[in-house]
């Protein structure tokens, strides 16, 4: 029996002890557990990746919605500003037109008042001149006749 034989026997005994102690099963279970743990980690990583992609897609969607909403707000503000500007312009034009009309009415009233004042002054002047001329040239008898004629004219106009 040489050394190779004893080495073979030792190897067989060692393998028998390893099998008796169920080392291959423990190694298998350990490897299976590790494989399961790796599978779970891969599945969890896949799930996290999908969630991240969903969150990214949602973020992009919300970003686009926010941009659209901001654009709508700007467009609405521009429309409102334009409407306010047009309303202010229209109101200013109406105000100017009213003020012009009022000024024209005041001018027309002042013109009418001035014409009436001139006429009244002319009538007063004519009456005063006629009175002074009549006072110089008409005697009492002629004044009575003139008064009677004037009274007759007034009566004829009133009837």
Curated annotation (Swiss-Prot):
One GO MF term attached to the UniProt entry: proton-transporting ATPase activity, rotational mechanism
Q: Which GO terms describe its cellular component?
A: plasma membrane; proton-transporting ATP synthase complex
Alphabetically sorted, this entry's keywords are: ATP synthesis, Cell inner membrane, Cell membrane, CF(0), Hydrogen ion transport, Ion transport, Membrane, Transmembrane, Transmembrane helix, Transport
Annotated S-S bridges: none
The record's listing under InterPro entries reads: ATP_synth_b/b'su_bac/chlpt, ATP_synth_F0_bsu_bac, ATP_synthase_B_chain
Q: Does the keyword Protein biosynthesis apply?
A: no
Question: Where's it found, cell-wise?
Answer: Cell inner membrane
**A family per Pfam:** ATP-synt_B
Chief place where the protein resides: membrane
Task: Please give, as recorded in its UniProt entry, the membrane topology of this protein.
Answer: Single-pass membrane protein
What residue intervals traverse the membrane?
1-21
Q: State the family named in the UniProt similarity comment for this chain.
A: Belongs to the ATPase B chain family.
**What role does this protein play?**
F(1)F(0) ATP synthase produces ATP from ADP in the presence of a proton or sodium gradient. F-type ATPases consist of two structural domains, F(1) containing the extramembraneous catalytic core and F(0) containing the membrane proton channel, linked together by a central stalk and a peripheral stalk. During catalysis, ATP synthesis in the catalytic domain of F(1) is coupled via a rotary mechanism of the central stalk subunits to proton translocation.
NCBIfam families, per this entry? ATP_synt_b, PRK09173.1
Q: How does it assemble?
A: F-type ATPases have 2 components, F(1) - the catalytic core - and F(0) - the membrane proton channel. F(1) has five subunits: alpha(3), beta(3), gamma(1), delta(1), epsilon(1). F(0) has three main subunits: a(1), b(2) and c(10-14). The alpha and beta chains form an alternating ring which encloses part of the gamma chain. F(1) is attached to F(0) by a central stalk formed by the gamma and epsilon chains, while a peripheral stalk is formed by the delta and b chains.
Q: What is the protein's given name?
A: ATP synthase subunit b 2
From what organism does this protein derive? Answer: Brucella ovis (strain ATCC 25840 / 63/290 / NCTC 10512)
Q: What is the lineage of its organism?
A: Bacteria, Pseudomonadati, Pseudomonadota, Alphaproteobacteria, Hyphomicrobiales
């Amino acid at each position: 029996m040489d050394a190779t034989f004893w080495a073979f026997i030792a190897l067989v005994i060692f393998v028998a002890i390893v099998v008796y102690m169920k080392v291959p099963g423990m190694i298998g279970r350990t490897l299976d557990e590790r494989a399961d743990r790796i599978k779970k980690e891969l599945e969890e990583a896949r799930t996290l990746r999908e969630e991240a992609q969903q969150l990214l897609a949602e973020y992009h969607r919300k970003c686009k919605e926010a941009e659209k909403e901001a654009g709508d707000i700007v467009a609405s503000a521009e429309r409102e500003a334009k409407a306010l500007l047009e309303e202010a312009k229209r109101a200013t034009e109406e105000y100017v037109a009213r003020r012009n009309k009022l000024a024209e009415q005041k001018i027309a009233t002042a013109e009418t008042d001035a014409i009436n004042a001139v006429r009244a002054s002319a009538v007063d002047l004519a009456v005063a001149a006629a009175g002074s001329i009549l006072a110089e040239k008409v005697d009492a008898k002629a004044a009575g006749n003139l008064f009677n004629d004037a009274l007759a004219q007034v009566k004829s106009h009133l009837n």
